[in-house]
Curated annotation (Swiss-Prot):
Molecular functions (GO terms): lipid binding; proton transmembrane transporter activity
Topology class, membrane: Multi-pass membrane protein
Record note on quaternary structure: Subunit of the F-type ATPase which has 2 components, CF(1) - the catalytic core - and CF(0) - the membrane proton channel.
Annotated family: Belongs to the ATPase C chain family.
SUPFAM superfamilies, per database record: F1F0 ATP synthase subunit C
Protein's name in the database: ATP synthase c subunit
Cross-referenced HAMAP family: ATP_synth_c_bact (MF_01396)
This protein's GO CC annotations: mitochondrial membrane; proton-transporting ATP synthase complex; proton-transporting two-sector ATPase complex, proton-transporting domain
CDD domains per the UniProt record, alphabetical: ATP-synt_Fo_c_ATP5G3
Matches recorded under PROSITE patterns: ATPASE_C
Source species of the chain: Caenorhabditis elegans
Post-translational modification: Trimethylated by ATPSCKMT at Lys-84. Methylation may be required for proper incorporation of the C subunit into the ATP synthase complex and mitochondrial respiration.
Keywords, ordered alphabetically: CF(0), Hydrogen ion transport, Ion transport, Lipid-binding, Membrane, Methylation, Mitochondrion, Transit peptide, Transmembrane, Transmembrane helix, Transport
Pfam families per the UniProt record, alphabetical: ATP-synt_C
Amino acid sequence: MYCQRLALPLTRSLLASRAPLALRMENAVAARMISTTVARKDIDSAAKYIGAGAATVGVAGSGAGIGNVFGALVIGYARNPSLKQQLFSYAILGFALSEAMGLFCLTMGFMILFAL
């Protein structure tokens, strides 16, 4: 909203001229690119960095989930050592699911940074 005030409204005067429609639209796009200010680009890049940072917060949740899984494995093994193999297979499954969600969050952060 604030960035719109910084851009000069040249498109109205270009569209009001009597030039052919294709030429007017081309000039309107060019005028929009010319009137973009440095402040608008800075705001866009700041929003991109904030979004990428917010997307990678999920990696911390993944780390906490992995800690919970292996903490529960140790407690379960201490209570019943005969179920070692079954508990370990469940722990590996929980680790894989938690790690996959963390990798999705990290991938989205990189996509926001480098693909947009």
